[in-house]
UniProtKB/Swiss-Prot annotation:
This is Ubiquitin-fold modifier-conjugating enzyme 1. The active site is at C116. It comes from the Eukaryota. It holds the Pfam family UFC1. In absence of UBA5, the active site is solvated by water molecules thereby reducing its nucleophilic activity. A linker region of UBA5 is required to reduce the amount of water molecules in the vicinity of the active site and elevate its nucleophilic activity. The gene is Ufc1. Keywords: Isopeptide bond, Ubl conjugation, Ubl conjugation pathway. GO terms for biological process: brain development; protein K69-linked ufmylation; protein ufmylation; regulation of type II interferon production; response to endoplasmic reticulum stress; reticulophagy. There is a cross-link at K122 (Glycyl lysine isopeptide (Lys-Gly) (interchain with G-Cter in UFM1)).
C-alpha cells in the first residue's frame, strides 16, 4: 500500500474471516454477510470523511454486483456505471471491475471496460486472502484507478462533463 492516508482508510475496513466463494453454499452466505458489513462500514467511514464516492448493490445470490461511482474534478462530478461478477474461485481470485462507458478510452483497461489492476492490486489481494473483500477492492482497486485515470482522460479531452456536453 502506498501512503499513510491509504493505510489509515484500509485499517478502518473490517477484514473478512470466512474463506468461501459462490460454490460453498452455506459458507458463502456467511461470507456475504461479512462482505456487506465491511462495505457498510467503508461507506459510513467515507461519508464521515466527506469522501462518499460509490454505491453498490448485488443480485440475490451476491454473485453479480452493479452500481455507480463518481469522481470530482475541478468541482465537477463525473459519474460512471460499474459492474462486476464474483469469480467462481473467489476469494482467491479478485473480481474484475468494469466501467463500461470508459471501454476503449484508456490503455489501462481490458475489453469490456474491465479496469487493469494486475500490477499493483492483484499481488496485494493475493497476499491478503481471505481477509480482503469487496470494500478493499473498491478502496485499493477502483478508487486509485479512478484517481489516476479520470483526470488524465479529462485532460486529454477523451471524456467531458455532462453539462459541458449539453452546452
Amino acid at each position: 500500500m502506498a501512503d499513510e492516508a491509504t493505510r489509515r482508510v484500509v485499517s478502518e475496513i473490517p477484514v473478512l474471516k470466512t474463506n468461501a466463494g459462490p460454490r460453498d453454499r452455506e459458507l458463502w452466505v456467511q461470507r456475504l454477510k461479512e462482505e456487506y458489513q465491511s462495505l457498510i462500514r467503508y461507506v459510513e467511514n467515507n461519508k464521515n470523511a466527506d469522501n462518499d464516492w460509490f454505491r453498490l448493490e448485488s443480485n440475490k445470490e451476491g454473485t453479480r454486483w452493479f452500481g455507480k461511482c463518481w469522481y470530482i474534478h475541478d468541482f465537477l462530478k463525473y459519474e460512471f456505471d460499474i459492474e462486476f461478477e464474483i469469480p467462481i474461485t473467489y476469494p482467491t481470485t479478485a473480481p474484475e471491475i468494469a466501467v463500461p462507458e470508459l471501454d476503449g478510452k484508456t490503455a489501462k483497461m481490458y475489453r469490456g471496460g474491465k479496469i487493469c489492476l494486475t500490477d499493483h492490486f492483484k499481488p496485494l489481494w493475493a497476499r491478503n486472502v481471505p481477509k480482503f473483500g469487496l470494500a478493499h477492492l473498491m478502496a485499493l482497486g477502483l478508487g486509485p484507478w479512478l484517481a489516476v485515470e479520470v483526470p488524465d482522460l479529462i485532460q486529454k479531452g477523451v471524456i467531458q462533463h455532462k453539462e459541458k456536453c449539453n452546452q
